[in-house]
Amino acid sequence: MRPALTDYQHLASGKVRELYRIDGGHLLFVATDRISAYDHILKSEIPDKGRVLTAMSVFFFDYLSRTAAVSNHLAGPPDDERIPEEVLGRALVVEQLEMLPVEAVARGYLTGSGLIDYQQTGTVCGIALPSGLVEASRFDEPLFTPATKAELGEHDVNISFDDVVGLIGAERAEELRDRTLRTYSQGAAHALTRGIIVADTKFEFGVDARGELKLADEVFTPDSSRYWRADDYAEGQVQNSFDKQFVRNWLTGPDSGWDRHGDQPPPPLPPDIVDATRARYIEAYERISGLRFDDWIGVSA
């Protein structure tokens, strides 16, 4: 018989996830259907989103472990007997790590906050770039562009590699940069074979009791990555995406009536935007993994 969620101590709530303690060395990592944008948790939820994030992370944790020797925090299978029935398919048993205070961001293309930095300074996170780059320009080599980990409701801030050295030391910073770029390159190469460009992505790493750096949190999900369709990619324009950029675009468009820079929270998402977002997340998972989402464990919303 599986335990109930109430059997575990609730430790923390994030924008999307809930964290529980299983025992002295293991945590239960639960992905909800909440969606955030521009540092706000939206009133609307995306049905099955938590299951998609979990399924995608499980696929990539396994793929990266096999193909790039990237170790991770998983401490059991998706149907681990310690996972309560009510969160099966959207929860994982993970090893408790000492998390690094840095968002490990890898960028293969110029967009988002990187584009804003470049337009203002000609650099991204202190890295000088050639002139003449535009929206969606591809870099010759992926960039490691770290950011601070902001508190809930605050903005992540891009920082330089020297800032990372100041936070975690030179040796660990170099290891983090190398691991981030290796992980991104391997995962992005796989996605490209499935017709998807991973423009950028955000990883989180922690250190285990033996001092080993491990990939944690989520990996290559539509929440943590920008997914573009490879078949209609064109430099200099906003790309068609499979990720939550679709929601961001609606929020900042004329139909929402919301001022991103005002003091009001975002409005609820219309049903058609909710449905389209769910469909995009599922399509991203199925295209990249080659698996059917209907076969993933847990009860569909």
From Swiss-Prot:
GO terms for cellular component: cytoplasm. It catalyses: 5-amino-1-(5-phospho-D-ribosyl)imidazole-4-carboxylate + L-aspartate + ATP = (2S)-2-[5-amino-1-(5-phospho-beta-D-ribosyl)imidazole-4-carboxamido]succinate + ADP + phosphate + 2 H(+). Disulfide bonds: none annotated. The keyword DNA repair does not apply. Its EC number is 6.3.2.6. It comes from the Bacteria. InterPro entries: SAICAR_synt/ADE2_N, SAICAR_synth, SAICAR_synthetase_CS. GO terms for biological process: 'de novo' IMP biosynthetic process. Keywords: ATP-binding, Ligase, Nucleotide-binding, Purine biosynthesis. Pathway: Purine metabolism; IMP biosynthesis via de novo pathway; 5-amino-1-(5-phospho-D-ribosyl)imidazole-4-carboxamide from 5-amino-1-(5-phospho-D-ribosyl)imidazole-4-carboxylate: step 1/2. Belongs to the SAICAR synthetase family. This is Phosphoribosylaminoimidazole-succinocarboxamide synthase. The gene is purC.
